[in-house]
UniProtKB/Swiss-Prot annotation:
Catalytic activities: dTMP + ATP = dTDP + ADP
UniProt KW keywords: ATP-binding, Kinase, Nucleotide biosynthesis, Nucleotide-binding, Transferase
Keyword Nucleotide-binding among record annotations: yes
Source species taxonomy: Bacteria, Pseudomonadati, Campylobacterota, Epsilonproteobacteria, Campylobacterales
Function: Phosphorylation of dTMP to form dTDP in both de novo and salvage pathways of dTTP synthesis.
A Pfam entry, by short name: Thymidylate_kin
Family: Belongs to the thymidylate kinase family.
Name under which the protein is recorded: Thymidylate kinase
Gene3D superfamilies, sorted: P-loop containing nucleotide triphosphate hydrolases (3.40.50.300)
GO BP terms: dTDP biosynthetic process; dTTP biosynthetic process; dUDP biosynthetic process
SUPFAM superfamilies for this protein: P-loop containing nucleoside triphosphate hydrolases
UniProt cross-references to CDD domains, sorted A to Z: TMPK
Organism: Campylobacter jejuni subsp. doylei (strain ATCC BAA-1458 / RM4099 / 269.97)
Gene: tmk
InterPro entries: P-loop_NTPase, Thymidylate_kin-like_dom, Thymidylate_kinase
Amino acid sequence: MYVVFEGIDCVGKSTQISLLKEIYKDAIFTLEPGGTELGKHLREILLNKTHPISKRAELLLFLADRAQHFEEILKTNQNKLIISDRSFISGMAYAKDFENDLLFTLNSFALEDFFPQKIIFLKGDENLIQERLSQKELDSIEKRGIEYFLSVQDKLKKVLHFLKEKISIEILTLDAKESKEKLHQQIKEFLQ
């Protein structure tokens, strides 16, 4: 089973994944971008830009990472439990300047139509996101501000709705304000 955690920065994806690592010791844990050696280099380019990158070039770098991630991680472990911190869904949401149909087609190509079966979508309100952003050093994407993150979160919701029409997926939407223990319990039940 291929499971992905989705949500903007600071909603607790990494915390919940860490808790699952204690339970699912044989699972494959990965992330996008950066789940492969190529992906680590691309992630560094994308998060710590020293030169401006066009939106189209940025999209194609993310797609290159996704295609490599599919070949190295997803394809070789299709019969195992795979838990990923983000996926193509975030890629579609962050690529706000492009149409969903185009993004879906490009991602289908990069993934050879291998999509997650279960999605855990953690969402946060403005106060929670602002509080958590203020507690960390920000990368170039995080420096875009709270309004940017809220618009991405809104786009994530729209992308998930769009995907329900395209592929067979189960989605669990959770409020990131809940305690990590309560969220963990709900996630464990969803994965059963």
